[in-house]
Amino acid sequence: MNKEKRLKYAMVGGGKGSFIGPIHRMAIRMDDLADLVDGCYSHTDDWRDLIARCRGKIDFLAVCTPNSSHYEITKAALEAGMDVLCEKPLSMTLDEATELERLARRKRRVLGIPFTYSGFPMVKLARDLVKRGELGKIDKVVLEYSQGSFRKIDFSKPLDKRNAWKMDPKKAGPSCVVADIGVHGFHLIEHVTGLEVRQVLADLSSFAPGNRLDDDASMLLRLSGGAKAMFTVSKVATGEENGVRLRVYGDKASLYWNQEENNYLSVKYPFAPERIYKRNAPYIGDLSAASKALSRIPAGHHEGFIEGFANIYREFCAAVRDRKPHDFPGAHEGVRTMRFVEAALRSNKNGNRWEKV
């Protein structure tokens, strides 16, 4: 049981049939951080009534709805004096995301976004190894996020609601794959390397029958410091499940992290043996206090997605409680990802030209 005062929260969306709603609830319960005291789980319910009746009675609101309502719900909650953790993307447009960032700052509210992979212990180790110069100067990054989820759908039948809204521009916005999972990869690149993506050249495609939005993207990136990146993201990668694979190449060493084997991190050197770091091994604390702090169970017992999600919530709830900065993705990261989404869309529309992020 968490000895700190338990928080109270409400949730919009994430009801029956939702994938992400139960993930939020399980993640919060993992550390006994907060109690769910109210909710609005169906489109037939009015989230405005929820915000009105919860004003001054909850510590934060979790927004787990489709993309189209992220902005208006988050804005209303911030204006009502609530802290908010909103599902990605933060909004449907860069202008909306920027407005929410400014509103949160003006209202002195905590605004978080669950870019889950930054909550994984070995991602923190990767970030800290880069920070301490283990890889040297970063020259190249390769990020792959491959899912085959759209290959499992029978498009001759009505789509289930979990997939249907992601292909509907009115609910998903102008992008499917880049805004849905591409933002995770973008955030992972910037989080681990400490570099900013400055430009993008994007080639977006729609292969799934009837999909009006992108379900596959091949992109080149230019990063601060002169580094370059290759970034591919897909929902039509046949046979793949959730293949997030990150490679970072420096002039001294390189690293490799695979989400499907996320308890390990590989570092390679030109004139020395490869090192395989294991999550929560005895030496980890000396290399990365953050990685050690995020590990929950002994090495050899695998942790994964829900634990990573719970780590985001643990940091977010700490910020809600003590009103100090903590290590979780916030409004700034939400704005950065929307800058990237819009730049990728412009590049694709303008003949695959380089666009500023």
Where are these regions (language model features)?
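Rossmann-fold dehydrogenase core element
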Residues: 99-117, 137-140
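C-terminal helix-rich "cap/oligomerization" subdomain common to oxidoreductases
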Residues: 1-6, 49, 60-62, 272, ...
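C-terminal glycine/acidic-rich active-site capping loop/insertion
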Residues: 6, 218, 223, 252-328
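Beta-loop-alpha module in the N-terminal Rossmann-like domain of NAD(P)-dependent dehydrogenases
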Residues: 43-103, 310
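Predominantly a Rossmann-like dinucleotide-binding segment in NAD(P)-dependent oxidoreductases
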Residues: 5, 16, 118-211, 265, ...
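Hydrophobic residues in well-ordered beta-strands that form the structural core
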Residues: 86, 92, 111-113, 257
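Glycine-rich, aromatic-lined ligand/substrate-binding cores of catalytic
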Residues: 184-188, 192-254, 259-263
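N-terminal Rossmann-like dinucleotide-binding module
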Residues: 1-42
